[in-house]
């Protein structure tokens, strides 16, 4: 199969939405019956984002095969049907690590190791390895053109055009075209300088996607085309929109997919964007509004809970409901009480690590349980729900997790037992390092047939993604059924608790896995869809 690559770079400033633009463009080409995939190149020195603070870098997106990756891979999976793997995201750190390991083993036969060719060849090899059985590979280069960290990646993608032919590569450059409100002018100079910087590296962009507050007029586009040496029709205006799911249509209307297919000489049908039209229709034609509270400790950066936020919106789309999301600091609940929870129609506690903010989360679970507020616990959220239940319902006041109190009398939650660590991606050497030491990726879960979860999924066996190193201590689970808390999902051979449900409650479900990673705007996810449905019901009850 012929190898074709589209390389996407960014200029002027960061945070232009390069990942979303890449994903949306891939979605349009997928809608033309093309098989596409996307790679993200991250220029930081970390091996992966697994140990980076969510407040700095946003969430860690977990793939089916257990890779801890950049949050942009979440955007990719939400826009296209292709599932990402560990091959779809790599960092400068992982490249250097691979090269240095080979050098230590003597695989370079005594050669002096250099950026060119050793680092760039390793980058090229990884990129090209993703081109099997796909029509087009999109490659998003992280960072901004001009950053020193991105130079090896840019050099590698420059060389790929030489290796496989310019006719099999397209370079797309995403830039900012600012609007100056005082003079009421759109300024093209930053884009010109950004392209000049890219040209100095040896890359001539074929398409310019210009991010702007307003539609860029034809005159300004013609000027950009002239000074940046691109065709006028290849200067694309991408304005700010109220929904990212409108972007595929915006790109299609400006015939970006047609330009790409013409360059690659691909004879494919027009893009069928009917599924995206349905998503937008459901977003615009809503019947309800609900407010969902996400209770966490990384609320300064909404990107820390990106997939959860998007999954809640998907649940809203499927219920034709506007979902308003409040990010609430659990530490403030601990200090100031539960008043700020009174306006919520549903409460969600997402995954997390460490003891900070735990007391506020325990207070929140108790509030939701007592007041019949729909509650959804994910990963740590399930563990918190169990600790609260053991303390306040069963009466084990010292119930805790060994993550928060190593010597607690009743360790309801503890490290995954050694006997269960023969699962994929588990590293037994937890104390010596943090990176790559968790139960990661897709794991099988067996559902109890008379449960809500079984009804929602419509099957006996499911597979969901995990990211945790602590689990429910099986020594204590026999006590909970008689108090009304049901274990409705377990891992293979009943080793680990995966889902719990509270009886006699409007909606109280918690799971050890991360369902947000598999939710999409076109399909949603059964747990999130039903959670929003319960929030709508709770709002109606509350209004009576």
Curated annotation (Swiss-Prot):
The active site is at 379 (nucleophile), 514, 516. GO terms for biological process: 'de novo' CTP biosynthetic process; pyrimidine nucleobase biosynthetic process. Belongs to the CTP synthase family. The keyword Methyltransferase does not apply. This is CTP synthase. CDD domains: CTPS_N (cd03113), GATase1_CTP_Synthase (cd01746). Pfam families: CTP_synth_N (PF06418), GATase (PF00117). Homotetramer. Allosterically activated by GTP, when glutamine is the substrate; GTP has no effect on the reaction when ammonia is the substrate. The allosteric effector GTP functions by stabilizing the protein conformation that binds the tetrahedral intermediate(s) formed during glutamine hydrolysis. Inhibited by the product CTP, via allosteric rather than competitive inhibition. GO terms for molecular function: ATP binding; CTP synthase activity; glutaminase activity; identical protein binding; metal ion binding. CTP binds at residues 14, 147-149, 187-192, 223. UTP binds at residues 14, 187-192, 223. Catalyzes the ATP-dependent amination of UTP to CTP with either L-glutamine or ammonia as the source of nitrogen. Regulates intracellular CTP levels through interactions with the four ribonucleotide triphosphates. CTPSs have evolved a hybrid strategy for distinguishing between UTP and CTP. The overlapping regions of the product feedback inhibitory and substrate sites recognize a common feature in both compounds, the triphosphate moiety. To differentiate isosteric substrate and product pyrimidine rings, an additional pocket far from the expected kinase/ligase catalytic site, specifically recognizes the cytosine and ribose portions of the product inhibitor. ATP binds at residues 15-20, 72.
């Amino acid at each position: 199969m012929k190898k074709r690559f589209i390389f996407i770079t960014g200029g002027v400033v960061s945070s232009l939405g390069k990942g979303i633009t890449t994903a949306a463009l891939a979605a349009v080409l997928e809608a033309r019956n093309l098989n596409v995939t996307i790679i993200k190149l991250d220029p930081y020195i970390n091996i992966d984002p697994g140990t980076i603070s969510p407040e700095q870098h946003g969430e860690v997106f977990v793939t089916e095969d257990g890779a801890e990756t950049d949050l942009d891979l979440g955007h990719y999976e939400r826009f296209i049907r292709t599932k990402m793997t560990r091959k779809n995201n790599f960092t400068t750190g992982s490249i250097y690590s691979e090269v240095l390991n080979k050098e230590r083993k003597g695989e370079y036969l005594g050669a002096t190791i250099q950026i060119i060719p050793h680092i760039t060849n390793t980058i090229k090899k990884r990129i090209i390895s993703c081109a099997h059985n796909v029509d087009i590979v999109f490659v998003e280069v992280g960072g901004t053109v001009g950053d020193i960290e991105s130079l090896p990646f840019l050099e590698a993608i420059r060389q790929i055009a030489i290796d496989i032919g310019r006719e099999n590569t397209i370079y797309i450059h995403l830039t900012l075209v600012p609007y100056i409100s005082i003079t009421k002018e759109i300024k093209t100079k930053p884009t010109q300088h950004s392209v000049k910087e890219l040209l100095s590296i040896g890359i001539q962009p074929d398409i310019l996607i210009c991010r702007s507050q307003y539609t860029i007029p034809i005159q300004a586009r013609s000027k950009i085309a002239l000074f940046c040496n691109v065709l006028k029709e290849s200067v694309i205006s991408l304005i700010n929109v109220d929904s990212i799911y409108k972007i595929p249509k915006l790109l299609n209307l400006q015939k970006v997919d047609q330009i790409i297919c013409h360059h690659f000489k691909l004879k494919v049908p027009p893009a069928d964007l009917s599924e995206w039209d349905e998503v937008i229709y459901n977003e615009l034609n809503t019947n309800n509004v609900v407010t969902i509270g996400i209770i966490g400790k990384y609320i300064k950066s909404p990107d820390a809970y990106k997939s959860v936020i998007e999954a809640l919106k998907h649940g809203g789309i499927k219920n034709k409901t506007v979902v308003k999301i409040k990010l609430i600091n659990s530490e403030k609940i601990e200090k100031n009480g539960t008043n700020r929870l009174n306006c919520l129609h549903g409460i969600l506690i997402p995954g997390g690590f460490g003891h900070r903010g735990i007391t506020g989360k325990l207070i929140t679970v108790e509030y939701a349980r007592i007041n019949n507020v729909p509650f959804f616990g994910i990963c740590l959220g399930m563990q918190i729900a169990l600790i609260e239940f053991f303390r306040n319902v069963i009466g084990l006041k010292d119930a805790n997790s060994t993550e928060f109190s190593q010597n607690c009398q009743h360790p309801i939650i503890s490290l995954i037992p050694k006997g269960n660590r023969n699962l994929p991606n588990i590293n037994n050497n937890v104390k010596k390092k943090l990176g790559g030491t968790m139960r990661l990726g897709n794991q099988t879960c067996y559902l109890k047939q008379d449960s809500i979860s079984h009804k929602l999924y419509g099957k006996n066996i499911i597979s969901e993604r995990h990211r945790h190193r602590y689990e429910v201590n099986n020594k204590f689970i026999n006590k909970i059924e008689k108090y009304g808390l049901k274990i409705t999902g377990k891992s293979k051979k009943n080793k680990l608790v995966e889902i719990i449900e509270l009886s006699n409650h409007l909606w109280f479900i918690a799971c050890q896995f991360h369902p947000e990673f598999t939710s999409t705007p076109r399909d949603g996810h059964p747990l999130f869809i039903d959670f929003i449905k319960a929030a709508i019901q709770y709002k109606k009850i509350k209004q009576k």
